[in-house]
Amino acid sequence: MTYVLPSLPYSYNSLEPFFDEKTMIIHHTRHHQAYINNTNSILNGTHYENLLIEELISKLNILSIENKLALQNNAGGHINHSLFWKWLKLNTILKDDFKIILEKNFKSVDFFKKQFEKIALSHFGSGWIWLIKKYDNTLRIVTTVNQNTPLMGKEISGISGIPILGLDLWEHAYYLKYKNNRSDYVNAFWNVVNWDEVSYRFFNISNM
């Protein structure tokens, strides 16, 4: 199987003024594409080249393959970005069914957002911040380094769970618009969160 760049469900300028068009173009067509190209190159001619990306990610800790760390970084970059694009959309509304879930886990939506922002800003260097669903249906905010994902499992990423929301903390995701001001980028994120997708993943995704 050759992995391909997924099309975005919106135009590159659809998230303006919060996520700018130039960043979206570069992020999607260059950064994400590079992760895909590298993953395909590493897997070419191996026993694993026909795995779906979700299968590959879930089995990383047991794969026997050269350049395993490079595969982890690049395959992680592919699946992380494939999810990320789905979490972005202007003008969606946090509906009551999932709002109740957030309030149950974090006392209030505002407190959840403040905790998410605090953890995102305290994360050193490149990585991702996630809202994950644990296997008891509780929610946790966690971060992973580089292109690690909770889908890789605790052995690799230090945490396991189902991502229902995530934000790219690599500088390439925001530097053109926000420079070194990660705080403004994280705050802007709330304006483009696709709450419909977040809610769908919580109520409908039990595993990858």
Curated annotation (Swiss-Prot):
Enzyme Commission identifier(s) = 1.15.1.1
Which residues does the record give as Mn(2+) binding sites?
H27, H81, D168, H172
What does this protein need as cofactor? Answer: Mn(2+)
Q: Which PROSITE patterns match?
A: SOD_MN (PS00088)
- The signal peptide annotation in the UniProt record is none
Q: What is this enzyme's class at the first EC digit?
A: oxidoreductase
UniProt catalytic activity = 2 superoxide + 2 H(+) = H2O2 + O2
As to how many cofactors bind and how, the note says: Binds 1 Mn(2+) ion per subunit.
Which terms in the GO cellular component ontology are assigned? cytoplasm
Coiled-coil blocks: none
Keywords (A to Z) from UniProt: Manganese, Metal-binding, Oxidoreductase
What one GO molecular function would you report for this record? Answer: superoxide dismutase activity
Matches recorded under Pfam families: Sod_Fe_C (PF02777), Sod_Fe_N (PF00081)
- Subunit info? Homodimer.
Q: Which family does it belong to?
A: Belongs to the iron/manganese superoxide dismutase family.
Report the function annotation for this chain. Answer: Destroys superoxide anion radicals which are normally produced within the cells and which are toxic to biological systems.
Q: What is this protein called?
A: Superoxide dismutase [Mn]
Q: Which organism is it from?
A: Buchnera aphidicola subsp. Baizongia pistaciae (strain Bp)
